[in-house]
Structures are given as structure tokens and as C-alpha cells.
């Protein structure tokens, strides 16, 4: 009986965590193309976002690394912007299990 309760509790906790992923804020809120330093660090804040894997599909932008912090509500996303990157809305995909959340991040001229 204890094993069943433990299993059920673990399952319910995983469902809560799975359903809770959202993004409240990304800092800085936008960035400029053509900067001297091609590296961009984004601090992503949102409930449960620390469990997510991250991908970027935008010409001239590559994902350098993702750092998970002690708090499950923060992620640091490091991007490399080529000199040729064009201004626009860059989709960043956050994935936990089968759930995907796409947030557009603006690159300005």
C-alpha cells in the first residue's frame, strides 16, 4: 500500500511540474543586431522553466549553452549572433517532455 501511495504521489507531482511550465519574463527584453560582442545571455524566468530544454531556429543565431540554476524557475540561455543576423522575431522553443512552449524574442536593428 505504501508503494502504491508513493507511486501515485510521484505521478501527481510529475503532472503538476509538467503542466506548470510558463515564461513570465526574459531579460533583456530585446537585443540589437550588429553589436561588437556576438554573445547574448538571456535570463528566462517562469514557473518550472528550469526543467526545459531549449532550441533556437533562426538564421545567424546559434545556441551556445543553457545553464540551469538552483531555482527551478530560472534558466540562463547563451546565444551566439553572427554579424549577418537580421532583425526580426526569433522563436525560442522550450520543451519539457512532449510539451513545447515557443516564445518570440525580438532582435532590433
Predicted regions and their residues:
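Residue-identity detector for threonine
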Residues: 16-17, 33, 93-95
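Positively charged n-region of N-terminal signal peptides that target proteins for export
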Residues: 1-4
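Short non-domain terminal segments
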Residues: 9, 28-30, 92
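Immunoglobulin-like IPT/TIG beta-sandwich domains and homologous Ig-like subdomains
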Residues: 37-97
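Bacterial N-terminal signal peptides
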Residues: 7-16
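Beta-strand/beta-sandwich contexts
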Residues: 20-51, 99-109
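Short amphipathic alpha-helical segments, especially helix-boundary/capping motifs
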Residues: 18-20, 66-67
Amino acid at each position: 500500500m505504501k508503494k502504491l501511495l508513493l507511486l501515485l504521489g510521484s505521478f501527481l507531482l510529475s503532472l503538476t511540474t509538467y503542466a506548470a511550465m510558463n515564461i513570465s519574463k526574459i531579460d533583456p527584453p530585446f537585443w540589437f543586431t550588429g553589436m561588437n560582442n556576438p554573445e547574448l545571455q538571456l535570463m528566462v524566468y517562469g514557473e518550472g522553466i528550469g526543467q526545459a530544454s531549449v532550441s533556437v531556429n533562426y538564421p545567424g543565431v546559434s545556441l551556445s549553452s543553457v545553464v540551469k540554476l538552483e531555482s527551478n524557475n530560472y534558466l540562463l540561455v547563451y546565444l551566439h549572433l553572427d554579424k549577418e543576423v537580421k532583425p526580426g522575431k526569433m522563436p525560442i522553443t522550450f520543451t519539457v517532455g512532449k510539451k513545447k512552449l515557443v516564445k518570440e524574442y525580438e532582435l532590433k536593428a
